[in-house]
């Protein structure tokens, strides 16, 4: 993963050449760069990334381009505050982090449509672009949504599902504790109640709605991109995050799914356990079951985290190689490392990439270079399939219902632990 907007243009060509020398043949760009294309509402400029892609095309590097909707610009959220996300009490998540928008504000859907259309038209025929990533980590950070736009859309979702309030009241058992609804406007996504205990059937439908909203938003991108892109250019996004039916997302809004693999998440806080850095194998097994192929869009390559949360120790010598081969052994046809060089500013100032702040070669770069040489001998493995002897049925309704069910919920933990260990 590479961020040309973080670095002086004089570094670009040398960075690309060093990556290619290390066996890195594809980079992902632009997922957080909306302002570089639309710094003022309705005024589109492409010169920055045009210059970067011109440099890329001096080399053999390939590019995965992104739609930059994970971080809407300040001008947008200031002028249209209804696009902002909210917590369960209605407190707004303001500009300054990421994933602070909601999927259902009509104005955000329109602004998304416009920026994706502009980018797809402008970059559709760039020969270095082999694929596109939609947004970035849909439902990461926030997997439940409580903005006003979400509640309005939730009522539409329920009307389409149940047709009448009588049928909804019957399905939800609202006669219990006098919860009966007599008007659609009385229904909200789960709000705080005594002991934070809401109607369990409303709760499950809300999680289904969150998934539906995510899939619909992803499909908005996908349909626009597919309209403009050459047939050999793929469209993907990452998983696995809360409250998304990834089998439907894959079938309706992606060519294939990718995964962000950070095996050391939280290891410092959780204490010693020889299996902890390999718990990601369970997720790799899950994503393997979503479609016929998958890739790793972000493979951990260094220590770190955000400046105020998420701790990851430095990978031991050989550990990046272990994780890379673990992904390949689980069926990954593509592995990309996060990130090329550690950023010197911002929230992820401690989230190390392959290179440290000093930009000097190090043991992590050498390890990845060695992996690249080994991969040349293993290239025939890409795309290969095999006949699995065992399958595990994964049911999204059961998974989501178990999140708040004090009786059956704990079985999720024990079942997963048993399968993994």
Describe these PLM feature segments.
Residues 5-21, 112-118, 239-250, 315-326, ...:
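Short, acidic/polar
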Residues 19, 27, 56, 119, ...:
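Conserved, mostly hydrophobic/aromatic
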Residues 12-93, 116-120, 221-229:
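Aromatic-lined substrate-binding rim segments of carbohydrate-active enzymes
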Residues 3-5, 30-33, 66-75, 130-139, ...:
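Short, solvent-exposed turn/loop segments enriched in Gly/Ser/Thr/Pro and often Arg
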């Amino acid at each position: 993963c590479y961020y040309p907007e973080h670095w002086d243009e004089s570094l670009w060509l040398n960075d690309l050449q060093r990556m290619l020398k290390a066996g890195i043949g594809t980079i992902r760009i632009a997922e957080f760069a909306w302002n570089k294309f639309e710094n003022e509402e309705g005024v589109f400029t492409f010169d920055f990334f045009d210059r970067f892609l011109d440099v890329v095309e001096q080399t053999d590097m390939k590019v995965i381009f992104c739609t930059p909707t994970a971080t809407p610009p300040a001008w947008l959220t200031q002028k249209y505050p209804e696009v902002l996300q909210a917590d369960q009490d209605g407190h707004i998540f303001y500009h300054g982090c990421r994933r602070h928008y909601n999927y259902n504000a009509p104005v955000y859907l329109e602004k998304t449509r416009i920026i994706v259309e502009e980018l797809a038209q402008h970059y559709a025929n760039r020969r270095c672009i082999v694929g596109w990533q939609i947004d970035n980590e849909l439902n990461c950070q926030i997997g439940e949504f409580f903005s006003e736009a979400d509640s309005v859309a939730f009522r539409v979702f329920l009307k389409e599902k149940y047709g009448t309030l009588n049928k909804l009241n019957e399905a939800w058992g609202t006669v219990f504790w006098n919860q009966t609804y007599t008007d659609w406007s009385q229904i909200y996504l789960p709000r705080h109640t005594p002991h934070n205990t809401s109607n369990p059937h409303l709760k499950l439908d809300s999680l289904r709605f969150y998934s539906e909203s995510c899939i619909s938003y992803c499909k908005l991108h996908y349909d626009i991109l597919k309209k403009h892109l050459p047939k050999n250019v793929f469209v993907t996004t990452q998983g696995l995050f809360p409250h998304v039916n990834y089998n439907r997302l894959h079938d309706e809004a992606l060519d294939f799914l990718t995964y962000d693999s950070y095996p050391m998440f939280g290891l410092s806080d959780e204490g010693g356990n020889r299996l902890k850095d390999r718990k990601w194998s369970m997720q790799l097994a899950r994503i393997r079951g979503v479609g016929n192929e998958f890739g790793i869009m972000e493979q951990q390559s260094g220590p770190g985290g955000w400046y105020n949360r998420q701790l990851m120790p430095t990978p031991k010598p050989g550990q990046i190689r272990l994780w890379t081969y673990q992904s390949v052994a689980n069926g990954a046809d593509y592995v990309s490392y996060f990130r090329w060089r550690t950023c010197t500013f911002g929230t992820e100032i401690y989230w190390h990439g392959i290179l440290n702040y000093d930009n000097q070669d190090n043991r992590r770069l050498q390890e990845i270079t060695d992996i690249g040489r080994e991969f040349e001998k293993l290239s025939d493995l890409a795309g290969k399939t095999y006949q699995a002897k065992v399958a595990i049925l994964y049911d999204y309704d059961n998974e989501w219902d178990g999140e708040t069910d004090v009786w059956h919920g704990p079985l999720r933990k024990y079942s997963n632990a048993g399968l993994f260990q």
